Amino acid sequence: LYNAVEMGWTLLFITHTIPHKRTDDMLELMRNMDTARKLYGKGGTMSRLMKQLGFKGNVIRLEPTFGNHGIHPHTHTILMFDRKLTNEETERLTSYLKDKWKKSCIEAGLVTKKNERTFDKYGFCADTTGDIEKLIRYMTKNEKEQSVSGLAKEMTNAADKKRGRGVEGDDEDGKA
């Protein structure tokens, strides 16, 4: 990631979450989220847009945390593009991805009329600042250790993390 930033690439940090409540079955939630993620990644429009913007790869981490509303499954994704995206391109991309995530969650049976409003507020969050130090601090949950090795450890470690606030309002307490 550090090399990508040095080469002038754009890093876009996205959090995807799904509606949930205390009584939900964890395995069912995870299966439905997996279905939504598969639907999210499919489609010619997605492929064309990502190619047009110079998409080179991503890092995805599934993170189930537990809070007052039960299990809170969500993913953190870092999208990497081989050039600096314009503000207009970033806005178009994040708008498209947010809409695509909602449609995928509806199709997977996760979003209903009852929980749609909450999903609209918490279901998708994009940090478009490109602040690599902020990203590393958040992903490692360690204000003192700002290292790429710490980020790599965070992205690959399956251990659950403590409840907390995320980037740009990601509420890991499970309000979505």
Please provide the spans of the model-predicted regions.
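Catalytic residues for metal-mediated phosphoryl-transfer on nucleic acids/nucleotides
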Residues: 1-75, 79-176
